[in-house]
Design a protein with these regions (language model features):
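Beta/alpha (TIM)-barrel catalytic core signal, keyed to glycine-rich beta->alpha loops juxtaposed to Asp/Glu
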Residues: 1-148, 154
Length: 157
């Protein structure tokens, strides 16, 4: 969902010049775990944690916006209707519904995933192997993007 900021300019430029695209951070630093539900909740530990000093502050500045959490709520509601997780719909959307031309779509674009342990890796890989999302979930993710778009982080810093 957050990766869509690259759609209007970067993806067309890369396509024009034959450059493959590899995105990173498809789970918004773990925000798609669903553990944090509000910008007002600042955990002590973890990537968004207050003890993470500069990194925690950077991630909170990047993602802790009302619109982001509104979008996550839209996505989570859609996921729950199909017994899916936020993590799963984020990864499956990147592979099957984004403008990336992944191998699933005959291209070489890719998605870099990051994990903290083997269980997360196995779960993410299993989710990446699943097929496209139900149409109503994709529609909800489009709605979520519209909710978050105005305050979404840019692809350039």
């Amino acid at each position: 969902m957050q990766a869509r900021a690259i759609e209007p300019e970067l993806i067309p430029a890369c396509r024009k010049y034959g450059i493959d695209i590899v995105i990173y951070n498809p789970l918004a630093g773990g925000l798609f775990s669903g553990k944090i539900k509000s910008k007002d909740i600042k955990p002590d530990e973890g990537r968004f944690g207050t003890k993470a000093d500069r990194v925690g502050s950077m991630y909170r500045d990047r993602y802790f916006k009302d619109a982001t959490f509104q979008a996550l709520k839209i996505a989570e509601d859609a996921a729950q209707k199909h017994n899916l997780t936020l993590l799963e719909i984020a990864l499956r959307w990147c592979v099957h519904h984004s403008e990336l031309k992944t191998r699933a779509k005959g291209g070489n674009d890719g998605v870099i995933i990051g994990v903290s342990n083997l269980k997360q890796l196995e779960g993410n890989l299993a989710d990446l192997e699943k097929g496209p999302l139900p149409d109503d979930v994709v529609k909800s993710l489009d709605e979520a993007w519209m909710a978050a778009k105005a305050t979404a982080p840019t692809y350039f810093r």
